[in-house]
């Protein structure tokens, strides 16, 4: 699986996930800096107030 891993509005970058990892995620929240977006491999548990979208295809988490 390949997932995007750039932060917020940085230029697009992606990486290959470890063998057996078939999910990508996109996590979004707000703080004093504004809206923060984090992307990567897997499907993490998030705190309340954090939007999480997980998906299972190549580069699906932009």
UniProtKB/Swiss-Prot annotation:
One of its GO terms (cellular component) is extracellular region. Residues 1-16 have a biased composition (Polar residues). InterPro entries: Snake_3FTx, Snake_toxin-like_sf, Snake_toxin_con_site, Toxin_cobra-type. Residues 1-22 are annotated as: Disordered. Disulfide bonds join 3-24, 17-41, 43-54, 55-60. Transmembrane segments: none annotated. CDD domains: TFP_snake_toxin. It comes from the Eukaryota. One of its GO terms (molecular function) is ion channel regulator activity. Keywords: Acetylcholine receptor inhibiting toxin, Disulfide bond, Ion channel impairing toxin, Neurotoxin, Postsynaptic neurotoxin, Secreted, Toxin. The keyword Cell cycle does not apply. The keyword Secreted applies. It is found in: Secreted. Expressed by the venom gland. Binds to muscle nicotinic acetylcholine receptor (nAChR) and inhibit acetylcholine from binding to the receptor, thereby impairing neuromuscular transmission. Belongs to the three-finger toxin family. Short-chain subfamily. Type I alpha-neurotoxin sub-subfamily. This is Short neurotoxin C. It comes from Laticauda laticaudata.
